[in-house]
Amino acid sequence: MRLENKVALISGGARGMGAVEAKMFVQEGAKVVIGDVLDEDGKQTESEINETGGECVFVHLDVTDETAWQDAVAAAVDRFGKLDILVNNAGIARINNVEDTTSDEWDLVMDINAKGVFLGTKAAIPEMRKAGGGSIVNISSIAGLTGGRTSSYAASKGAVRLLTKSSAIQYAGEGIRCNSVHPGVIETPMTTPMMLNTQEGRDLNASRHPLGRVGQPEDIAYGVLFLASDESSFMTGSELVIDGGLTAQ
């Protein structure tokens, strides 16, 4: 198993990509803590994993709250003894140009998407140090590479990209790796209402990708699994783009 004897904490793990990542991690031998503000969905995912023989704990986690992050890390250590893997998966999207973006919207998106990654990383590093190393996987976006029309979202995901590189350099000597994942358009409960809720929208977004379809959560989860595992032991500060060829055009 690719994650045997590993302990992982996944933010935004109640549904969508985070839930798929959690289930895949457990299938590969990991023990998992999922954190989210969506308590009902989180408890459902926890039950689904445990009913199949996996080991999963759900904790309420507001990623903008430093104390909540400390509590989530403590939950992983208290239940499973250590922390090896952090997946900063939680995020939101707002699609507005600069003039239509309010200060409140900017602050909300930056707090969840960028500050949340910072706080998660900060909370996880001391326990990874005790464990002798670890892997941090930050979910950015192709919007963090190319910009586009999503002002606050692109800025937040660009921040994730460079925070990843900064963290990678700072902690490489302690065996703590940090890499970012940059998805294209992925069919999730977050993106579907905004982009994929009509056949026209689905066709348009599928056509943007040279492979001719939008991505599925599993497409991203397999990449996250690789970065979380020891198979990627010589990768840190890197960008894993999983976008159906969109940014190659």
Where are these regions (language model features)?
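A glycine/serine/threonine-rich, flexible loop-to-helix segment
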Residues: 173, 185-209
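Residue(s) in the substrate-gating loop at a strand-loop-helix junction
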Residues: 141
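Substrate-binding pocket helix/loop in short-chain dehydrogenase/reductase
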Residues: 97-98, 102-107, 201, 205
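Alpha-helical segment proximal to the catalytic Tyr-Lys
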Residues: 126, 169-173, 233
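Active-site helix of classical SDR
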Residues: 121, 156, 164
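Canonical Rossmann dinucleotide-binding motif of NAD(H)/NADP(H)-dependent dehydrogenases/reductases
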Residues: 3-33
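Short C-terminal tail/terminal secondary-structure segment
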Residues: 224-225, 236-249
